[in-house]
From Swiss-Prot:
Its EC number is 2.7.11.1. Threonine-protein kinase that phosphorylates histone H3 in vitro at 'Thr-3' (H3T3ph) and 'Thr-11' (H3T11ph), but not at 'Ser-10' (H3S10ph) or 'Ser-28' (H3S28ph). Plays a role in mitotic cell division during plant growth. Threonine-protein kinase that phosphorylates histone H3 in vitro at 'Thr-3' (H3T3ph), but not at 'Thr-11' (H3T11ph), 'Ser-10' (H3S10ph) or 'Ser-28' (H3S28ph). Involved in histone H3 phosphorylation in mitotic cells. Contributes to organ and plant development, as well as embryonic patterning. Pfam families: Haspin_kinase. SUPFAM superfamilies: Protein kinase-like (PK-like) (SSF56112). This is Serine/threonine-protein kinase haspin homolog. Residues 287-599 form the Protein kinase domain. Belongs to the protein kinase superfamily. Ser/Thr protein kinase family. Haspin subfamily. The keyword Cytoplasm applies. Keywords: ATP-binding, Cell cycle, Chromosome, Cytoplasm, Cytoskeleton, Kinase, Nucleotide-binding, Nucleus, Serine/threonine-protein kinase, Transferase. The active site is at D448 (proton acceptor). ATP binds at residues 293-301, 310, 407-412, 448-453, 486-488. PANTHER family: INTERLEUKIN-1 RECEPTOR-ASSOCIATED KINASE (PTHR24419), SERINE_THREONINE-PROTEIN KINASE HASPIN (PTHR24419:SF18).
Length: 599
């Protein structure tokens, strides 16, 4: 065998003969600047991407990727262009000022003279001004801001300018507006005799004849030293007038002293401040002669001379006789309603509706303070004799009341003794005719004509005059005259406003005992009105006439025959078909009591 060859030793030997293998290392050096003199610039390295241009800066993943190759080239081009800041081109220079000439300051004398002439010229208005007709003159004119006054207080001040006596409530706004516009001179003592009151559309125009709504103020107010002078409406400054009156008298109420409803009541009552009881009663009688003659849930009744004074506490924060006291705004409506019904008693030759059925309101006063000892004495004497169902009248100093001063109408039907059937018929025909007249004049509904709200008295008169929609008629009285009172629940349309009491706020009124005639009548009223008490539903008057017939049949004793009772029952049956008192007054039951037939 041949000699074996050691391959590994040969390999090692050959490597030793060839020498060491050269090592490859990276060498870093500065890049040579391109030759600026060269006109051609090689951009090939940009496209190849072997290196990143230093002018581009670090890679921006957010927006650099969206740039096109062309766009990148344009950026590179700008990097090697002369990027030195360029000088701004010189603008046109102003010519130098010639030597020896002085530049004058601007002269606006002509302009000043022009505007001075304009300012001195009074320019008459060529279009209506929103404030008042005047001239525009140089300078700023400041229109004084009038303080906020209630409508009623404003009109009270206007009436004070026109007349030194107090007038009626301005709730019926047209009354005072019409009066103030037409009067430029001082009126006589019969204040507001020229006022008129609108009536519902169905009433004829003649029914808006002149009426005296509210009497003049009492002697104390009339005697006040308030200057009266001729004055035109446009020259009245309400703010100055209020300040002047405030300085001459401490009797004028302010908004700080009373709430607005009390101020409205003062205006409606013709007062500048509340009275105390002695002041109010002294006008009608000696205070020592005051006697209590009756009471009700909401107040007390006292006799003062030939008048009856009904006192109703208002706006207190505690209950009286178990009931919440009435609010001033509720009494305000009753005050206006009372004055409105007074018009039906006025004997005017042009009156379209007239009747003496509603009690005459002689005066209404707003009082404040506790009961006077004289009144407490009268109250306790009544309590000892009759046993009062009301609370003892212990009231605080700031308690307010409305005192209605009414004509003495006699005794109520509950206590009055009817002698015979003719007197009973007279009662029914007077009540029916009275409701019919008020329906025609004011869409009136009493809504609470129970036997305590009808007063009867005897007199020597055989007949009473009535006018219904212009037709005159005389009613036989047989010596008995009735007066309807208490308009608390009543509804009336004054021509300016509908006054009513929302009975939905008194659900207990309709929860009286079953079988009781008065309670049943309330429930029948509710069914007729469907709880819409503002609406006109003359049928409610008929319901109370039916109630009166029931009272005569079941509660009152008088001389009568079975024939008379049959006539009353027949009348009740026919009344079930009537929708108003105007229809009922034409019933055959009343035909022989009307000297002139109403049709």
């Amino acid at each position: 065998m041949g000699q074996r060859v050691d391959l590994w030793s040969e390999v090692i030997k050959s490597e030793e003969e060839d020498g060491d293998i050269p090592k490859i290392e990276a060498v870093f050096q500065r890049r040579k600047k391109p030759d600026k003199s060269s006109e051609a610039v090689n951009f090939g390295w940009l496209v190849k991407g072997a290196r990143t241009s230093s002018v581009n800066g670090p890679k921006r993943d957010s927006w650099a990727r969206s740039l096109s190759t062309r766009g990148r080239e344009s950026i590179a081009v700008r990097a090697y262009v002369n990027n030195q800041p360029q000088k701004k081109a010189a603008g046109r220079k102003k010519p130098p000022i010639p030597k020896g000439k002085v530049v004058k300051a601007p002269d606006f004398q002509k302009e000043k003279e022009y505007f001075r002439d304009i300012d001195a010229f009074e320019l008459l208005e060529e279009s209506p001004s929103p404030n008042k007709s005047s001239t525009w003159t140089m300078g700023e004119q400041v229109v004084p801001e009038m303080p906020h006054l209630s409508t009623r207080l404003e009109k009270w001040l206007i009436s004070k300018k026109l007349n030194h006596t107090c007038g009626p409530s301005s709730t019926l706004s047209k009354i005072l507006e019409n009066s103030a516009i037409h009067q430029e001179s001082v009126c006589d003592n019969d204040a507001f005799d020229s006022l008129s009151l609108k009536t519902p559309d169905k009433s004829s125009a003649g029914n808006t004849s002149v009426f005296r709504l509210i009497p003049s103020c009492d002697e104390n107010l009339a005697a006040e030293d308030v200057p009266v002078r001729k004055i035109k409406m446009e020259s009245i400054d309400l703010e100055d007038e209020l300040k002047r009156l405030s300085l001459t008298s401490d009797l004028i109420p302010t908004h700080q002293d009373f709430d607005q409803p009390i101020l409205d009541l003062l205006s409606a009552c013709g007062q500048m401040r509340p009275s105390n009881f002695i002041e109010a009663f002294s006008k009608f009688c000696e205070p020592e002669s005051i006697v209590k003659i009756g009471e009700g849930t909401y107040g007390e009744a006292f006799r003062a001379g030939s008048s009856v004074c009904k006192i109703v506490p208002i706006d207190g924060d505690f209950r009286v006789n178990g009931e919440v006291q009435k609010r001033a705004d509720e009494l305000l409506e009753e005050v206006i309603l009372s004055w409105t019904l007074n018009q039906l008693r006025e004997c005017e030759t042009t009156a379209q509706n007239l009747c003496p059925t509603y009690i005459k309101t002689q005066d209404i006063k707003l009082c404040q303070g506790p009961y006077d000892p004289i009144l407490i004495k009268a109250w306790e004497e009544w309590d000892a004799k009759h046993g009062s169902e009301n609370d003892h009248p212990d009231f605080p100093e700031k308690q307010c009341y409305v005192m209605f001063v009414l004509e003495h109408g006699g005794k109520d039907l509950e206590s009055f003794v009817l002698l015979n059937f003719d007197e009973a018929r007279s009662l029914l025909v007077q009540a029916t005719a009275g409701l019919a007249v008020a329906e025609a004049a004011f869409e009136f509904e009493h809504r609470d004509l129970h036997w305590g709200n009808i007063l009867l008295s005897r007199n020597n008169s055989d007949t009473l005059p009535f006018i219904l929609e212009g037709k005159q008629v005389c009613i036989k009285t047989f010596g008995v005259q009735i007066s309807i009172i208490d308009f608390t629940l009543s509804r009336i349309n004054t021509g300016e406003k509908i006054l009513f009491l929302d009975l939905t706020s008194d659900p207990y009124l309709f929860k009286g005992p079953k079988g009781d005639k008065q309670s049943e009548t309330y429930r029948k009223m509710k069914a007729v009105t469907e709880d819409y008490w503002e609406g006109s539903f003359a049928r409610t008057n008929v319901l109370w006439l039916i109630y009166l017939v029931d009272i005569l049949l079941t509660k009152k004793s008088f001389e009568r025959s079975s024939k008379h009772e049959r006539e009353l029952r027949s009348l009740k049956k026919r009344m079930e078909k009537y929708e108003s008192a105007k229809e009922a007054v034409s019933d055959p039951f009343f035909s022989d009591m009307l000297m002139d037939q109403i049709s």
